Amino acid sequence: MTKYIFDATSFSSFSKNEPKQIIILCHGYGGDGQDISALALNWRRFLPDAVFLCPNAPEVCTVNPSGYQWFDMTVENDETILEKSLVAEKKLNTFLDQVLDDFQLDITNLALVGFSQGSMMIIQTALKKKEQINCLVAYSGKIINKKHLSENIVSRPKIFLMHGDKDTIISPSHLLESKEFLVQQSLKIKTKLFKNCEHKISVEGSSLGLEFLRKNIL
């Protein structure tokens, strides 16, 4: 197995067969791959020929040194945030290419899942990637920089955006803003707003995410 650019929590195919799909799950700010791997554990038997990889983001988190960040979110300057996100995007792209090469699978067999800052990363990375990823499931996220993304979109994978209506970390208003923006860019977008749900992945959200993956990648 290739030595990846990121440390990752990983799960081989539930069927023990040669993998036919790859699901990469990107955690939120201050979390790690182990955190989001709970989704992989819940989904594995329903995607039996998929391998799951849950990488740790490249930087130690500024506000939670026991966790990781894709980029520093304590700064409030949009240009600085974009600049830092582009550094992380380059690294995530390297990781995706390493994994695809390792398993000798086409990018059409790759799906990305993200939570919070991880969602921000997968949207920006996937839409700018020349080869089109199969689909994205993005929980509780937003678009990092609409102007930058609108000028650099080259891929249009199917995307499922989900958010809790009681989210105080990333406002649920970003769900509709992101949908409106992405539809304007000719992407197929599915959305779900959960009632009485805070900044987390609900049980229903997990089930709907799995259903979306099964529909698109199997």
Regions found by a protein language model. Give the residues of each.
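C-terminal catalytic histidine-bearing segment of alpha/beta-hydrolase fold enzymes
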Residues: 160, 176-218
